[in-house]
């Protein structure tokens, strides 16, 4: 993704761009994920490089070099990718829902056949309108990219439809996307100011259906090792326990940004824990500001926090050849706890084992954001541990333990 620098100008044009379906104000719908066999054998550093590039961070050479490699996968680990089925025009596509971007881009009839083979493709409906002179382009840190044209077409998720959604049709995609047969594109759920369409950014699907919804929010219940669910327009109280802890969102740059009060490290991958238990051995002062992003696989935090965590993992080392922190796959991994307004959001230690590199070493789900002024990223490693509410009123974001 590219960073948008003229935010004010972009915001000024949104009201005239797209029109949602007739207002009902009572809609609520659920969009469950589905599991797709994962055939691509990317090195885990590729996910790390993508995250760094997406948020404008410098990509260390070691990470860039490692991202170009591959590793074997096993049927029992990293064997599925979780996507959401979305009807675009007349086509049902498997899309990644991404709260860190604002583009809806897809493989299409415009994509060369040798690139689209094995993917479901978008076929513009009879009522689709091409936006002449409009284009889009995305680039990621692992050298993957895509670009193309823009149509206005009907998009439906969970039975709720907008008839004038900007659909970014891929005319060319890089080999990294071609090889990833599990996904047919991406649907952004950040604030619309981040949309990359030129000459005028377009609204997200969520913004286009907002007036139809019972409540101006969506929730996600992402799971570790199984499909999760996105719910739009309502909060399903059966999916969480206890009260939801809310904190203010900083959306000045278009992202779902928030500030945690601090963190602690304790417990372990084989231990039980309570939210306020004595096993949470270390409490560290100083707030942590970051971005909640379902489109980033890893959790990226400052060097001092990352180093603090891995000094509690026996055998952990920062491996230049692998592009990040690695550790013995049988290591005991402590829990990571983020304190948000008095609520302790616990990431179980087992979530920190992102991917096996070889028969003995594994790549960590927590990596460095690079420090300095670069943002911290609370990606799927963190979000899969929580029930999360993304509320445009405020705006604010809420967290609770999953039921």
Curated annotation (Swiss-Prot):
Family the UniProt entry places it in: Belongs to the peptidase A1 family.
Signal peptide: 1-20
UniProt-listed PANTHER family: ASPERGILLOPEPSIN-1-RELATED, BETA-SITE APP-CLEAVING ENZYME, ISOFORM A-RELATED
UniProt keyword list: Aspartyl protease, Disulfide bond, Glycoprotein, Hydrolase, Protease, Secreted, Signal, Zymogen
Disulfide pairings: 329-362
Coiled-coil parts of chain: none
Subcellular compartments: Secreted
GO molecular function annotations of the record: aspartic-type endopeptidase activity
Propeptide: 21-67
A cellular-component GO term for this protein: extracellular region
UniProt-listed Gene3D superfamilies: Acid Proteases
Principal EC category: hydrolase
Domain Peptidase A1: 82-400
Stated name of the protein: Aspartic protease pepA
């Amino acid at each position: 993704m590219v960073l948008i620098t003229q935010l004010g100008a972009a915001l000024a044009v949104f009201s005239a761009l797209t029109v949602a379906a007739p207002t009902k104000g009572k809609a609520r719908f659920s969009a469950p994920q589905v599991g797709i066999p994962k055939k691509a054998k990317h090195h885990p550093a590729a996910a790390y490089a993508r995250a760094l590039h997406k948020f404008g961070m410098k990509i260390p050479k070691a990470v860039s070099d490692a991202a170009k490699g591959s590793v074997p996968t096993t049927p029992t680990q990293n064997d599925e990718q979780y996507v959401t089925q979305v009807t675009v025009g007349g086509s049902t596509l498997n899309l990644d829902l991404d709260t860190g971007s604002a583009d809806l881009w897809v493989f299409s009839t415009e994509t060369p056949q040798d690139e689209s083979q094995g993917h479901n493709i978008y076929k513009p409906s009879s009522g689709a309108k091409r936006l002449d002179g409009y284009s889009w382009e995305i680039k990621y840190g692992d050298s993957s990219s895509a670009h193309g044209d823009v149509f206005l077409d009907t998009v439906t998720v969970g039975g709720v439809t907008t008839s004038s959604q900007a659909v970014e049709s891929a005319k060319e995609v890089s080999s990294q996307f071609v090889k990833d047969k599990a996904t047919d594109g991406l649907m952004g759920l950040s604030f619309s100011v981040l949309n990359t369409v030129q000459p005028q950014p377009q609204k997200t699907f969520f913004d286009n259906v907002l007036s139809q919804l019972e409540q101006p929010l969506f929730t996600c219940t992402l799971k570790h090792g199984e499909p999760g669910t996105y719910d739009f327009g309502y909060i399903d109280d059966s999916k969480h326990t206890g009260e939801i802890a809310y904190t203010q969102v900083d959306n000045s740059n278009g992202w779902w940004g928030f500030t945690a009060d601090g963190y602690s490290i304790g417990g372990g991958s084989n231990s039980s824990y309570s939210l306020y238990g004595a096993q949470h051995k270390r409490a560290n002062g100083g707030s942590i500001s970051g971005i909640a992003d379902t489109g980033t696989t890893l959790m990226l935090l400052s060097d001092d926090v990352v180093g603090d965590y891995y000094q509690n993992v026996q055998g952990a080392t920062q491996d230049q050849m692998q592009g990040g922190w690695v550790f013995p796959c049988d290591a005991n991994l402590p829990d990571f706890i983020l304190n948000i307004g008095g609520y302790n959001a616990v990431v179980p230690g087992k979530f920190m084992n992102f991917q096996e590199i070889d028969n003995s070493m594994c790549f960590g789900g927590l990596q460095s954001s690079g420090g300095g002024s670069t943002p911290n990223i609370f990606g799927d490693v963190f979000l899969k541990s929580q029930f999360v509410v993304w509320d445009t009123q405020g705006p604010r974001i809420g967290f609770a333990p999953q039921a």
